[in-house]
From Swiss-Prot:
Contains an N-terminal zinc-binding domain, a central core domain that contains the primase activity, and a C-terminal DnaB-binding domain. GO terms for biological process: DNA replication, synthesis of primer. Mg(2+) 2 binds at D319, D321. It comes from Mycoplasma genitalium (strain ATCC 33530 / DSM 19775 / NCTC 10195 / G37) (Mycoplasmoides genitalium). Its cofactor is Zn(2+); Mg(2+). The keyword Zinc applies. The lineage of its organism: Bacteria, Bacillati, Mycoplasmatota, Mycoplasmoidales, Mycoplasmoidaceae. InterPro entries: DNA_primase_core_N_sf, DNA_primase_DnaG, DNA_primase_Znf_CHC2, DnaG_bac, DNAG_N, DnaG_primase, TOPRIM_DnaG_bac, TOPRIM_dom. This is DNA primase. The keyword DNA-binding applies. Belongs to the DnaG primase family. GO terms for molecular function: DNA binding; DNA-directed RNA polymerase activity; zinc ion binding. RNA polymerase that catalyzes the synthesis of short RNA molecules used as primers for DNA polymerase during DNA replication. It comes from the Bacteria.
């Protein structure tokens, strides 16, 4: 009989950091006794990530990403610790029968303790706020900052007293809802001799880190409390804001304030700079996150993509000052390169930020201002015009900027949109030259079509302006045909044969309507659905032979290529599909169909 181990430490030793890193396609180089690699968590040109096989950890000396194999997976895939542990076990091929199953339900004990103490501190500071009667407490938030008590409670705002030196450690030692009890050393500053310290109290000076400040809790993407930002409420503190000390579980630059509270199915997301900007927009019914600075990194972008599957538009709403507006362009560039549709708030007031606008003009003006926005091309034209550049230079810059996005390069309908908008916004009279400029930046796209489709004459130049309408119409028609072909998703049909609930539920998402409209070459979708219904009426369990038995020879011959694609996915997925995965797959397919329907609709409007 196998003795099953209960030791989490022993299990973690089996998760080899080199196996994890190589699984993600990162090449490890050997230099002397060192293992180095290009760090996948930032734009690394020279190997800056060091790997220790003996300690089973990695460390990037450029971006400070560090940890064991689980930490690597968490950061790379934006997963919680427990899910990352399960994935690490799969990657390393660890046999679960040798380990007690309860290990897989645990979270990192050190991380869990960190969350628990931060949660206790949230409660402590909230209680302080409710009890404080001087102007620096609730009166400051309600009277001076005009926050209602519902908002204060929603964001778990608290207060650090002016005399926390005396009360903090003693009060937290007595905190009843945590086991084991909090030790003062856990609140002390981090040091080599006190590596568990969270930095709330300086043992040497006997001073609390936060005093006479509004305490704003910060959470990770999963909603776990990981730190605080403290807003000064007097003139004693030299810094307006002070943050919790950086920690392996708290990297402020990799988080987005308010992220965890938002609806996963939102369509529009505002990005602002500060906490009070989030409070203001939330009060006006807009969903917003704060950068807590001016930068946006790959970790944050991955989190947005992974969490908000229905997101259609990111609205950049940074402060109306030089630093905020100077940061907008670089953020647009990064978001554009990551395939986001971006809009930019066009400030029409002289107030510095959303909070200042709200305090002076109220919620109604906040709502009006939030809806004054430029699309990407409008912003770029305005941005480059302010630099007093020549019209042709502006055109080249805009086209070069946009075509860095691979999605745009492949989106033929956007070519038409680009030409029309630039002609309008730049009051461009020389359409011929503009069109040639677009073609120059779209060489890869041009090569896909013959001269007849592009109406290019034998000299290699685009036809004159009067022919532009014909040319663009041909491009749009081609774009529509190709988009229709791209709508082909064999996995949807495969899963409709694996679990009959997909056939029923996806009908509600207009499965018939979408695919009938596409008229795929060599594949009769309507007949497939009809055959799938017959198949399920005759079979209790999924099997490919059962499906083929309801098909006639003509259908098999005429749809051979498409059916082979479906069959391959069917056979691959059937062995690992579980009935309780149904809702997750269904949501994915419904979202996909919704997006594809919208794409077809947009293309039709252009025709």
């Amino acid at each position: 009989m196998v003795n099953k181990s209960n030791s989490l430490d022993e299990l973690l030793k089996q998760i080899k950091i080199t196996e994890i890193i190589q699984h993600y396609g990162v090449k490890i180089q050997t230099k002397g006794n060192s293992l180095l690699a290009l760090c996948p968590f930032h734009d690394d040109k020279n190997p800056s990530m060091s790997i220790s096989s003996s300690k089973n950890i990695f460390k990037c000396w450029a971006c400070n990403a560090a940890g064991n194999g689980i930490a690597f997976i968490q950061k790379h895939d934006q997963l919680d610790w427990k899910t990352a542990l399960k994935k690490a076990i799969e990657i390393c091929g660890i046999k679960l029968e040798n380990w007690n199953s309860n290990l897989l339900t645990k979270v990192d004990p050190k991380q869990k303790r960190y969350w628990e103490i931060n949660n206790a501190l949230i409660t402590y500071y909230q209680t302080r706020l409710k009890r404080e009667t001087n102007p620096n407490g609730m009166n400051y938030l309600v009277e001076k900052r005009k926050l209602n008590k519902t908002l204060i409670e929603q964001f778990q705002l608290g207060l650090a007293f002016h005399n926390e030196d005396k009360y903090l450690c003693e009060s937290m030692e007595r905190y009843p809802f945590i086991n084991p009890k909090i030790k003062p050393s856990e609140l002390y500053l981090f040091s080599k001799t006190n590596q568990q310290g969270l930095g709330f109290f300086d043992f040497n000076t006997k001073k609390a880190t936060f005093q006479n400040q509004i305490m704003i809790p910060i959470h990770d993407f999963n909603g776990n409390p990981v730190g605080f930002s403290a807003r000064s409420v007097d003139n004693i503190n030299k810094l307006k804001y002070k943050n919790s000390a950086d920690h392996e579980f708290f990297k402020k630059g990799e988080l987005l304030f308010n992220f965890h509270r938002l609806n996963k199915n939102l369509n529009q997301l505002f990005i602002v700079e500060g906490y009070f900007d989030v409070f203001t927009l939330t009060n006006s019914k807009f969903e917003a996150v704060a950068l807590m600075g001016l930068a946006l990194n790959d970790v944050q972008i991955k989190a947005i993509k992974a969490h908000f599957k229905e997101l259609q538009t990111l609205v950049l709403a940074l402060d109306n000052d030089a630093s905020g507006q100077n940061a907008v362009f670089s953020l647009i560039e990064k978001l554009n390169n990551n395939n986001f549709i971006v809009e930019i708030v066009q400030w029409e007031h002289n107030y510095k930020d959303w909070d200042e606008l709200y305090l002076n003009k109220g919620s109604e003006q906040v709502i009006l201002q939030a809806n004054k926005r430029q699309n990407l091309i409008e912003y770029l034209v305005s941005f480059f015009k302010k630099q007093q550049l020549d019209q042709r230079v502006i055109t080249n810059k805009i086209i070069a900027f946009l075509t860095k996005n691979q999605t745009i390069l492949n989106d033929h309908s956007f070519l038409i949109f680009l030409i029309k908008n630039l002609v309008k916004l730049l009051e461009y009279s020389d359409e011929k030259t503009l069109y040639e400029t677009v073609l120059k930046h779209k060489e890869k796209l041009v090569s896909k079509f013959d001269n007849n489709r592009f109406y290019i004459n034998t000299s290699g130049h685009a036809q004159p302006p009067q022919e532009l309408q014909k040319t663009t119409a041909a491009l749009v028609q081609t774009a529509f045909e190709e988009a229709v072909n791209e709508l082909w998703k064999p996995e949807i049909f495969a899963f409709a044969l694996i679990d009959k609930r997909f056939l029923v539920e996806l009908k509600q998402s207009h499965l018939d309507e979408v695919f009938k409209e596409c008229n795929f070459n060599l594949f009769d979708v309507e007949l497939f659905i009809e055959k799938a219904r017959i198949y399920w009426s005759e079979n209790q369990t999924a099997n490919w032979v059962g499906f083929e038995s309801v098909l006639d020879q003509n259908y098999l011959l005429n749809n051979k290529a498409r059916l082979l694609e479906i069959k391959d996915i069917f056979l691959d997925e059937l062995t690992c599909y579980q009935a309780n995965d149904f809702q997750n797959y269904l949501k994915t397919f419904q979202t996909l169909l919704k997006q594809q329907k919208q794409r077809l609709k947009n293309l039709k409007l252009t025709l």
